[in-house]
Amino acid sequence: MSNEAFLKQMRKPGDMNDFVNIVEWFASKRGCTSIKLSALCYYAYVWGLVFYNKEIAPFVFYKTEDGPVDKRISKIFGVSDKIITMGMKPKLSEELEKLLSLIWEKYSNYDGYYLMERAKVHYPFSEAQDVLLPKDMFLFYSWASMA
């Protein structure tokens, strides 16, 4: 089954569409690998918590040796530095499009390994047992700069 077909199969009403749309939005960007995709989704999620005080989609990030990973993303795309190729960008709300564009602008020049290593030294990852807690992410990144 192709990545596009699997994502289409996952579509559900409400917030799950935002999960799929966010994954598709980043995956449609030129030069995006699965590792970078996971990292960008992580940063979009945490900055969404900070800027909008809500979850932008039902991501669940696990502590793995690679960094914070939503297992659904790694199931679809694997964990590699192979470039992902996907079709057109999905249509998003203006608020979500603005956030994802900001994340892309800030982090797209870095490779996925660098972004994951960076996340691994931050409190929410270093203190997690298994699942990174949204509360820990919000508290840490509320005090961190986007730099």
What are these regions (language model features)?
Residues M1-A147:
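Domain-edge interaction signal
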